[in-house]
Amino acid sequence: AAVLEARGPRPAPVEARPESVDRREMDWGTLEKVVFSTRPEFRVPAYVLLPKGLRGRAPAIVDLHSHGGMFLFGKEKIINFGANHPAMIEYHKANYAGRPTATELVRRGYVVITIDAFPFGERRLMMDEDIAAGWERAKYSIEDVRRLNRKCRSKESALVKSLTYAGLTWPGITFWDDVRTVDYLLTRPEVDASR
């Protein structure tokens, strides 16, 4: 109980209200982008990966991306899209032996969900450079990605302080997002909740 209390207040329960915003076939199966609620104030972007040829239900896993100082991308860190951003290709080689985990798990028959943890990917701190680029990460060079990641890292302490003043904690936000992600995953018709 003390560990949960240290993470800050328990957020009010919310309906996930999932919305599918994109779905495409990949060589390893189906990639669906969804957004769903984890708190009254948060809509969380996620990818759900479904194994190729899935019939019936399959075991499922929540695959959490790393921190690694890479703020510009979140859930993309653990998926092979086939045509990845050059910064992600570099990241996959350095951190995942070129084999992102979500893609490897879906190839082994798991339904996989991965979210953008706060404050990564689509949930990261917005910088002036993001606004100028129209927030399209595909337009960034590898050096742009490195520069923006350095800038985000330099703002981490201010972010933590701001959350604390608001009565929240970064680990608490992450924890409850992860709990609500499991809750949402178990509602998916492709998931065998017993496995």
Label every PLM stretch briefly.
Residues A1-P9:
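Mature N-terminal segment immediately following signal peptide/propeptide cleavage
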Residues G8-A60:
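N-terminal cap/lid segment of alpha/beta-hydrolase-fold proteins
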Residues G56, L64-W176, Y184-T187:
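Cap/lid segment of the alpha/beta-hydrolase catalytic domain
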Residues E190-R195:
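Alpha/beta-hydrolase fold nucleophile elbow
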